[in-house]
Amino acid sequence: MKLLYVQLALGLFQLDHAVKQEIEQLPEQEEEHLLPGGLAGIKRLHKYGTAGGHARGHMDKIIRWSGCVTAGIAAMFAWVLTKPDRKMEKTGYTFLLGGALSNLYDRCRKGYVTDYIRFHSPWKRLNELVFNLSDFFIMAGAVLVWLGREGHSRR
């Protein structure tokens, strides 16, 4: 069963990597492609900093910081895999690790992260941000770890 979580983390990494490769084929200045319903669109963006454009121009520091965080996630992932039950936490760390590895790989290999999902909502700040699948994996993983820990602490 432990191997299943490892395979899922690697599968999430591969899925995001494959989507990013497809997105990279889009012309640089191409218009945003609205998805059905108009709530989100696809447009390629190279992010040379962190979320929200912070720390731009400091990729070496971002890579070191991201590497340390990813190593910590990997350590927690390995630790939680040794525990009985805790399926929600295991799944959460699986998503966290798959997403973190994909974004770290981009930063190390290309010097930027490829983002491509932009929302169209009533919230201006959300509309300014651009995401990739790994970002959603990381968010989902964090929620699952939190829920799993909450459930485990109530026992």
Q: How would you describe each model-predicted region?
A:
Residues 1-155:
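Alpha-helical transmembrane bundles and membrane-interface segments of multipass inner-membrane proteins
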